[in-house]
Swiss-Prot record:
It is found in: Cytoplasm. InterPro entries: DHBP_synth_RibB-like_a/b_dom (IPR017945), Sua5-like_dom (IPR006070), TC-AMP_synthase (IPR023535), TC-AMP_synthase_SUA5 (IPR050156). Required for the formation of a threonylcarbamoyl group on adenosine at position 37 (t(6)A37) in tRNAs that read codons beginning with adenine. Catalyzes the conversion of L-threonine, HCO(3)(-)/CO(2) and ATP to give threonylcarbamoyl-AMP (TC-AMP) as the acyladenylate intermediate, with the release of diphosphate. One of its GO terms (molecular function) is L-threonylcarbamoyladenylate synthase. Residues 9-214 form the YrdC-like domain. PROSITE patterns: YRDC (PS51163). This is Threonylcarbamoyl-AMP synthase. It comes from Psychrobacter arcticus (strain DSM 17307 / VKM B-2377 / 273-4). The lineage of its organism: Bacteria, Pseudomonadati, Pseudomonadota, Gammaproteobacteria, Moraxellales. It comes from the Bacteria. It catalyses: L-threonine + hydrogencarbonate + ATP = L-threonylcarbamoyladenylate + diphosphate + H2O.
Amino acid sequence: MSLSTPLITDSVIQAAHWLKKGQLLAYPTESVWGIGCDPFNQQAVMQLLTIKQRPIEKGMIVVTDSPSRITVLLEGLDAVERQTVLDSWQTDSINGTAKQAHTWLLPISQKLLITIPSWITGAHDSVAVRVIDHPLVKQLCAQMVSASNPYGFVVSTSCNPAGQPPALSLSEAQRYFLRHHANSNECVGYLKGETLGYQLPSQIGDALTGQIIR
């Protein structure tokens, strides 16, 4: 499809269809816009790494809709560690200005029926996971569940070229990537929506040590 007619939808089902076909997708998250793809599609991940100018060794964050999707990953934690992670994903009782998205590095379990690809874990023996709070993206993750992706994972990284601030709206996301790839055949789809307005930046922690990475 021509980049003069960008892929834009308000349908989660359509957006999931694009992801399953290897499309990159920009979408609203808790605080900023994110951009992602099917984490089990190596070509799509490599395309995303290229436009983000991100080294593969760093790994990628994935989001899902429910802790129940990743029970096997949470089993690698002790009771206290697991409860800390689960509590961080419960935001209903938190004041809006204090809400924060929490991503955790979870150890890779040997019990996984579907292995997490090396192009997602990077140089690490863990995977960075967040149960996302955004209702639209929760629905998107649920649509991504399949035999090859039982976790409902979608890659999630900030929607911006390297060196630029993350997009805060659909129009900003479009300006970044329609301009950035005007001379290439790479095309980004867009899922209409608004961020949840979280004011605090997202946080990344190591679930085993409790160390805050970012």
